[in-house]
Structure formats: structure tokens, C-alpha cells
Amino acid sequence: MEPLDDARLVAAVRSGNSAMAGAFYDRTRGMVARTVQRLLGASDSDFDDLVQVAMIELLRSLDRYRGECSLDTWTATISANIVYKHIRRRGLERHIFAREIAPEDVPQTAHQRPVLRGMVERVLHHLAQMAHERAWTFLLHDVHGYSLDEVAAITGATVAAAQSRLVRGRREVHERIANDPDLAGGLDAREDS
């Protein structure tokens, strides 16, 4: 049997075809898991629960999918929104930035590891002090690579509001880092090694 294209698959699930619900799950589950992993990390204790919540939300909101973007983009946006809401409820977590530093990028000398760890903690401290919306817009766009349209959808803002938050958030992050003697000293120490 030839696989259904996304439009026909969505139409079949919308019409109540329960046999196609399994095909929809198979089609979208990978993108959901990748999105949750990218934003939260696979080792997070809530990973499996959030994947399941995102799958449920996909089915609940299927009537709102208009086909204006690919099914993968829509799936990733819904999934990211679930993660965003979850993290907002539990607060800004330390591991968001810690995960961004790949183990192979981490200095291996005994002197460099604590310096880098301290720098990450300082950056997280500054993000936690910022307005929540600005910090998350900065993280989603500049760290995780979401487009402004996607950031707006994830955070429930207009594209103009997301753009404004991004500009102000970037400016604030840069100012905070530039004015932080611990970060400036840490950068100097890392560059000297």
C-alpha cells in the first residue's frame, strides 16, 4: 500500500478513521521527540511525559491545522509550545545552557572545567534576572534556532512582539555579560589557556 501524503493523512484522522490514527502517530512521533529533546534534553525526567502530552495536543488541535506549513513544522511548533509551557511552570532550569556546550567542546584540563562551569552559571543567573518573555525569546531564537514566526507561535505572541522581545533580550544579555566581571574574567582565563 502506498503511504498517504500528509494532507490525506490529516483528513483521514480528522474524519475519525481510527486506523489512520496509528499512521499519524508514526508520522509525527519522531518530530515530537526530536523537538522535545532539542529543547529539554532526552535525559530530562519529564521527557517521555512531554512527548506524550505533545502527541495528545497534536490530536486535540488537528482541526486547527490548515496546511499553511509542513506537517513537520506544525508538529515541531506544537511540541515546542508544550515544552515552553512546561518549563515556564517549573522555572528557568540550569541545564538549558549546560546542554548547549557539547562534551567535546568542554575544556579537559582541571583548571578550565570549573572556569567554564562558573561562566555557565553566571549566564544562567543573568537569564533568570531578565523578563521571562525576553529570556525565552532569546533562547528559542538565538540558542535553539527557531524562526521569529515559530517563536511567536510557541510563546503565544505576535511576530512583532517576538521581534521586539528578541531585540531587547539580545541587548540585555549582551549588556549583562559585558558588565559582569566574573564573565569577563572567565573569558580571559579561557582564552589564555
Q: Which residues does each predicted region cover?
A:
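DNA-recognition helix of helix-turn-helix
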Residues: 80, 84, 123, 134, ...
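Short, charged helix-capping/linker segments at alpha-helix termini
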Residues: 15-23, 33-53, 159
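N-terminal module of bacterial RNA polymerase sigma factors
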Residues: 1-30, 34, 191-193
